[in-house]
Amino acid sequence: MSSSLSQTSKYQATSVVNGLLSNLLPGVPKIRANNGKTSVNNGSKAQLIDRNLKKRVQLQNRDVHKIKKKCKLVKKKKVKKHKLDKEQLEQLAKHQVLKKHQHEGTLTDHERKYLNKLIKRNSQNLRSWDLEEEVRDELEDIQQSILKDTVSTANTDRSKRRRFKRKQFKEDIKESDFVKDHRYPGLTPGLAPVGLSDEEDSSEED
């Protein structure tokens, strides 16, 4: 009678343990009870439960670490993107001001120097910026406008210099014709009239 009760108690205990394992550790092999003899492949019931619980805790800790690491990376990317977007928007606003000053002809020397540097590096920067399409298009339009206006201004300056040089050259020619040897009209400068020796010419100049 006591043996039957003991066997029943063992089955009940085994069922309880298997129920706990099923809830806590899904997929873990169940403990089998056989004719009053409990066989466990890796040791006693307590050892098996302890080992599996530790394994479960390790897996949970590893998952928590991965989740924290992933969240940290996501947060870092968001902060970086927010900072980049802010810098790009500030630069866009600055370019718009420069564009306005360019059209109005009120660029300062500092702004003009900045534009010269901007034109050289703007193409590479535009490729690397991660902006919305419309912002990228706006920046490209500003770049092209600035480049066009700057080149036009440079061409105008060169044209003015060429016209001034031509005018100056013509004036120099006229002045040169006017200051010919006025003592002997019609003669090429540097030539003395027939009969006038070099000594006479030299004495007169003295």
From Swiss-Prot:
Q: Name one GO cellular component term.
A: nucleolus
One Pfam family, please name it.
RRT14
Fetch the InterPro entries from UniProt. Rrt14
Q: What keywords is this UniProt entry annotated with?
A: Nucleus, Phosphoprotein, Transcription, Transcription regulation
Among its keywords, does the record have Hydrolase? no
Quote the biased-composition stretches of kind Acidic residues, using this chain's numbering.
197-206
Q: Where in the cell is it found?
A: Nucleus, Nucleolus
Q: Where is this region: Disordered?
A: 178-206
Give the sites modified to Phosphoserine: 197, 202-203
Question: According to its UniProt entry, what is the function of this protein?
Answer: Involved in ribosome biogenesis, probably through modulation of rDNA transcription.
What more the UniProt record tells us is: Present with 3670 molecules/cell in log phase SD medium.
In which family does this protein belong, per the annotation?
Belongs to the RRT14 family.
Q: What is this protein called?
A: Regulator of rDNA transcription protein 14
Q: Organism source for this protein? A: Saccharomyces cerevisiae (strain ATCC 204508 / S288c)
Q: Upper lineage ranks? A: Eukaryota, Fungi, Dikarya, Ascomycota, Saccharomycotina
